[in-house]
UniProtKB/Swiss-Prot annotation:
One of its GO terms (biological process) is pectin catabolic process. It comes from the Eukaryota. GO terms for cellular component: extracellular region. It comes from Aspergillus flavus (strain ATCC MYA-384 / AF70). This is Endopolygalacturonase A. Induction: Expressed in both pectin- and glucose-grown mycelia. GO terms for molecular function: polygalacturonase activity.
Amino acid sequence: MQLLQSSVIAATVGAALVAAVPVELEARDSCTFTSAADAKSGKTSCSTITLSNIEVPAGETLDLTGLNDGTTVIFSGETTFGYKEWEGPLISVSGTNIKVQQASGAKIDGDGSRWWDGKGGNGGKTKPKFCYVHKLDSSSITGLQIYNTPVQGFSIQSDNLNITDVTIDNSAGTAEGHNTDAFDVGSSTYINIDGATVYNQDDCLAINSGSHITFTNGYCDGGHGLSIGSVGGRSDNTVEDVTISNSKVVNSQNGVRIKTVYDATGTVSNVKFEDITLSGITKYGLIVEQDYENGSPTGTPTNGIKVSDITFDKVTGTVESDATDIYILCGSGSCTDWTWSGVSITGGKTSSKCENVPTGASC
């Protein structure tokens, strides 16, 4: 009898010990979140996340950082943000092999008019940046419809990222919107932006550092055009292997631009502007300047940043009558090995202030 009781007790204790061992639960296939707090706390619990009509509280970030590898994020309905003067970002996303997309009819609305005061990031209200895409590697962002960012749109610091068919519509900010850059790229490799449609009041694209970056099939309206730079004065001051092609820039201050920082060091190399069409440009159709200091041109170029192996191929179109067709202001010996083919920009003035124009280019 005692032996039987001992056996029963041993079996019971053994079962209890087994039950006490933690069991690792697999992530559910899909989750739908209706609040930013739930999304933040539950984002690693599902392989597919649907964000349904999220109202992000004022002063908070829709935190999608540290997602599990292979997660799909779907924006559904309307995503909105409470008002507060702060730096942001309104959204942040990171992870590997992530897919970010939206359901049919969805929109992400920053309602930037609450912050717009004509000063952008240079004073007035403190405005939140829209979206940090930092360490979003081997991933994709597809088909997002974004409206009214308070200031800059996407801050990109990632590797192997494809951004496809994204619309950023800040057309409502024509009067008071400022510094509403669409895509700011830095310290990134293998970034491909294809089919972007942008209405804004600053750079459609600004590449400050990075390599193997492409921007193609873009439409840029109302801003400052397609820019390399400004390059210099950062921890990473190299831009190389960039192709900007088959795009339109309309009703903008500049068409295509390379700008480097006064008295800084760095490299801009193997950059191609190909098949770019311009219209309604109000300042410069094509501009390369090596004189930026504190965000403004000085008129005096320096040569610490080499701008070499640059291609301008079939950059064509018109500027306004009081604009300048082409302006090239290079430091002594710093702009070399340019290819200049099929460039035809008309309608404006011819600059008398070009300096150190590379062989083959015209100003």
